[in-house]
């Protein structure tokens, strides 16, 4: 699995677990609506750590909790 695919997968998992929608989590984390739209539409890759950090802040989890999945150990380049 590629890194960006793993991150998107985890974002969806967290939102489902927490009963959040993606936009709300990112807005709570301080991302602009236009950046969220570009991310959702695939115009922007979300593999920057700051993007993941903002999502985590909005979702109420830590970066450690976000990346604590086995599939992050088998990332393709």
Where are these regions (language model features)?
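Short, charged recognition helix plus adjacent turn
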Residues: 1, 13, 38, 67-77
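Residues within the helices of the helix-turn-helix
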Residues: 12, 23, 53, 64
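Short alpha-helical DNA-recognition segment
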Residues: 20-38
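Short, basic-rich loop-to-helix N-cap that marks the start of a DNA-contacting helix
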Residues: 43-57
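Intrinsically disordered, low-complexity basic tails/linkers immediately adjacent to helix-turn-helix/homeobox/MYB/SANT
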Residues: 57-70
């Amino acid at each position: 699995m590629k890194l960006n695919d793993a991150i998107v997968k985890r974002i969806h998992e967290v939102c489902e677990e927490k009963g959040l929608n993606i936009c709300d989590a990112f807005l709570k984390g301080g991302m602009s609506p236009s950046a969220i739209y570009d991310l959702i539409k695939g115009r922007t890759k979300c593999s920057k750590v700051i993007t993941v950090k903002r999502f985590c802040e909005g979702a109420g989890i830590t970066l450690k909790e976000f990346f604590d999945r086995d599939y992050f150990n088998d990332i393709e380049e």
